[in-house]
């Protein structure tokens, strides 16, 4: 088991898919949306569509902390299409840190946010093994490709011969895609 091999503290939650569908239907009905009859493709993929400048980053950060409180999730990857957006998300987290600490620290939630870089790929070990909420911001290009083109897919001596992507996989992170339409 990869989770045990890397010593990962990962997300773990077993929910009945019928319960998830019922919750989705309640949310859709409450918001005047078309109510789904089934989970699309049986997957647990959910979209929140918001116009630029309407607080998207705040909404998904707040969602991260609510998932941490309600379900004890601690691993989150924010996947973005460009370095500029990655830096913008990092800045937003830094600027909103005190706000989120005021809201969630009383509930026992502390968090770390970091940017993935191939230059410091070994930092995924800290992400994987920490018991705090971990938010890792990375570009889609940092994971596209293979061992010939991306460090994340290369085995590393400092990671016990594993690849950085193995550490991320072991945590079963919630992946939030910011501007997915720009990642194709």
Task: Label the predicted regions.
Residues 1-184:
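RecA-like P-loop NTPase motor core of helicase/translocase proteins
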